[in-house]
Amino acid sequence: MKSAEKSAKSLERRILHRVREAVAAYQLIEPGDRILVALSGGKDSMALLHFLSVMRRSNNGSFDLKAVHVRMANVDYRTDLQQLKEYAEQCGTGFELLDAAFEPDEKQGRSACFLCSWTRRKALFNYAQANGYNKIALGHHRDDLLQTAMMNLTFNGTFATMTASHAMDKFPITLIRPLCAVDEADLRLWADFTEVVATVKACPYDKIGKRHEMQGIMQQMQTFNPEFRQSLWHALNKAGKV
């Protein structure tokens, strides 16, 4: 077996192991669940659908999966929808395309990123509720959770982050993040090994704002202490914040 092939298989096993661990530790999936997978076309959501589909096959189809892409009419980005549909079919799931749009919020000053995210989320909620899905799987990885924790510490004075599982108040739906224990570096390697292309072209708002700046700060912290990310992750779990 070639070295690259061995590395790819080892990486696949490592990521799958961490997904399984997260699903068990945070009780993310139960038999009979009907789960929508938010498929943007980026590496994270592509990996999410792949590993959940692998779990589903190994669990004899004890839960249902369906991939959903929300197309934003007023955000200048492009996605190869045919590629997403074919990828979902390869993973053994259905595929649904939803259209949505948001209006700029000049009075309250909410960012375009917030409005876009909330509009997508609401479209997913409405579809899930109308079609009998009780959970929505999102592709946030461990670095996303750590970054959110740093944002909350810095700007809100709170020690909190996105949780692995979150039951919505106004919808009979639970958000789950099965990649929450997976490092982004592993997802990048997985995308390279499997030649899964991130079909989404760069969002115009992707490198604007405090969150992008925080990425640089966290890189500096990692240089200062190579165990920084692991220490923060341990603290979040010890405090029951994940």
Regions found by a protein language model. Name each.
Residues K2-A149, F155, A185-F193:
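ATP-dependent adenylation/nucleotidyltransferase module used to activate substrates
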Residues E12, S117, K207-K210, N225, ...:
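Generic structural signal for well-ordered, non-membrane alpha-helical segments
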Residues R18, A22, I217-Q220, S231, ...:
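Residues that form generic nucleotide/phosphate-binding pockets
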Residues D64-L65, K135, D143-T223:
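Catalytic subdomain that performs nucleotidyl-dependent activation
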Residues M72-N74, F102-P104, H166, V182, ...:
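Residue-level detector of flexible, active-site-proximal loop/helix-junction positions
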Residues E106-G109, K210-H212, K241:
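Short, solvent-exposed polar/charged micro-motifs at secondary-structure junctions
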Residues G209, E227-V242:
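A short, charged, Gly/Pro-tolerant segment at domain boundaries
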